Protein backbone atom coordinates (compact mmCIF):
# COMPACT_ATOMS: atom_id res chain seq x y z
CA UNK A 1 0.00 0.00 0.00
CA UNK A 2 2.90 2.35 0.70
CA UNK A 3 4.27 1.82 -2.77
CA UNK A 4 0.91 2.70 -4.26
CA UNK A 5 0.79 6.02 -2.36
CA UNK A 6 4.35 6.89 -3.35
CA UNK A 7 3.62 6.01 -6.96
CA UNK A 8 0.51 8.21 -7.00
CA UNK A 9 2.43 11.07 -5.38
CA UNK A 10 5.26 10.82 -7.92
CA UNK A 11 2.76 10.66 -10.79
CA UNK A 12 0.92 13.72 -9.51
CA UNK A 13 4.22 15.62 -8.95
CA UNK A 14 5.34 14.67 -12.48
CA UNK A 15 2.10 15.96 -13.98
CA UNK A 16 2.41 19.24 -12.07
CA UNK A 17 6.02 19.62 -13.24
CA UNK A 18 4.99 18.88 -16.83
CA UNK A 19 2.22 21.48 -16.60
CA UNK A 20 4.64 24.13 -15.27
CA UNK A 21 7.21 23.44 -18.01
CA UNK A 22 4.57 23.54 -20.76
CA UNK A 23 3.08 26.76 -19.40
CA UNK A 24 6.51 28.44 -19.25
CA UNK A 25 7.32 27.32 -22.78
CA UNK A 26 3.98 28.58 -24.09
CA UNK A 27 4.35 31.98 -22.45
CA UNK A 28 7.83 32.37 -24.01
CA UNK A 29 6.38 31.51 -27.43
CA UNK A 30 3.68 34.14 -26.99
CA UNK A 31 6.23 36.82 -26.15
CA UNK A 32 8.54 36.01 -29.08
CA UNK A 33 6.24 37.32 -31.86
CA UNK A 34 5.54 40.48 -29.88
CA UNK A 35 9.26 41.13 -29.42
CA UNK A 36 9.97 40.42 -33.08
CA UNK A 37 7.21 42.72 -34.34
CA UNK A 38 8.20 45.51 -31.99
CA UNK A 39 11.80 45.31 -33.20
CA UNK A 40 10.74 45.27 -36.86
CA UNK A 41 8.34 48.19 -36.56
CA UNK A 42 10.38 50.21 -34.09
CA UNK A 43 10.37 53.86 -35.04
CA UNK A 44 13.81 54.99 -36.04
CA UNK A 45 14.84 58.63 -35.98
CA UNK A 46 15.87 58.42 -39.63
CA UNK A 47 12.38 57.37 -40.72
CA UNK A 48 10.29 59.85 -38.77
CA UNK A 49 7.87 61.90 -40.81
CA UNK A 50 9.27 65.28 -41.67
CA UNK A 51 7.35 68.51 -41.34
CA UNK A 52 6.67 69.82 -44.84
CA UNK A 53 6.10 73.32 -46.08
CA UNK A 54 3.36 72.02 -48.36
CA UNK A 55 0.28 69.87 -47.81
CA UNK A 56 0.12 66.39 -49.36
CA UNK A 57 -2.81 64.42 -50.79
CA UNK A 58 -6.08 64.77 -48.83
CA UNK A 59 -4.54 67.24 -46.36
CA UNK A 60 -6.08 70.57 -45.44
CA UNK A 61 -4.94 73.43 -47.63
CA UNK A 62 -6.38 76.38 -45.72
CA UNK A 63 -3.08 77.64 -44.32
CA UNK A 64 -0.58 75.55 -46.31
CA UNK A 65 -0.15 75.42 -50.05
CA UNK A 66 -0.54 72.05 -51.75
CA UNK A 67 2.58 70.21 -52.86
CA UNK A 68 3.40 70.07 -56.56
CA UNK A 69 1.02 67.85 -58.49
CA UNK A 70 -1.97 68.69 -56.27
CA UNK A 71 -4.52 71.49 -56.27
CA UNK A 72 -6.64 72.85 -53.43
CA UNK A 73 -10.27 71.77 -53.75
CA UNK A 74 -12.45 74.87 -53.55
CA UNK A 75 -15.31 72.89 -52.06
CA UNK A 76 -13.58 70.73 -49.43
CA UNK A 77 -10.34 72.70 -48.89
CA UNK A 78 -8.23 69.54 -49.32
CA UNK A 79 -5.30 68.93 -51.63
CA UNK A 80 -6.47 66.69 -54.48
CA UNK A 81 -5.22 65.54 -57.87
CA UNK A 82 -5.97 68.01 -60.67
CA UNK A 83 -8.65 66.79 -63.06
CA UNK A 84 -10.72 68.45 -65.81
CA UNK A 85 -14.01 67.76 -64.03
CA UNK A 86 -12.93 69.57 -60.85
CA UNK A 87 -13.97 73.20 -60.51
UniProtKB/Swiss-Prot annotation:
Organism encoding this protein: Cyriopagopus hainanus
Pfam families given in the database record: Toxin_12
- This protein's major location comes to secreted
Annotated signal peptide = 1-24
What is this protein's name? U3-theraphotoxin-Hhn1a 19
Tissue pattern of expression reads: Expressed by the venom gland.
Q: Which residues form the propeptide?
A: 25-52
* Disulfide-linked positions: 54-67, 61-72, 66-79
CC terms in the record's Gene Ontology section: extracellular region
The record's family statement is:
Belongs to the neurotoxin 10 (Hwtx-1) family. 51 (Hntx-8) subfamily. Hntx-8 sub-subfamily.
InterPro entries according to UniProt:
Huwentoxin-1, Huwentoxin_CS1
Q: What does this protein do?
A: Ion channel inhibitor.
KW Isomerase (keyword) present: no
Ordered alphabetically, the record's keywords are: Disulfide bond, Ion channel impairing toxin, Knottin, Secreted, Signal, Toxin
Look up keyword Thylakoid and say if it applies: no
| Comment block on domains | The presence of a 'disulfide through disulfide knot' structurally defines this protein as a knottin.
Where's it found, cell-wise? Secreted
Q: Which GO terms describe its molecular function?
A: ion channel inhibitor activity; toxin activity
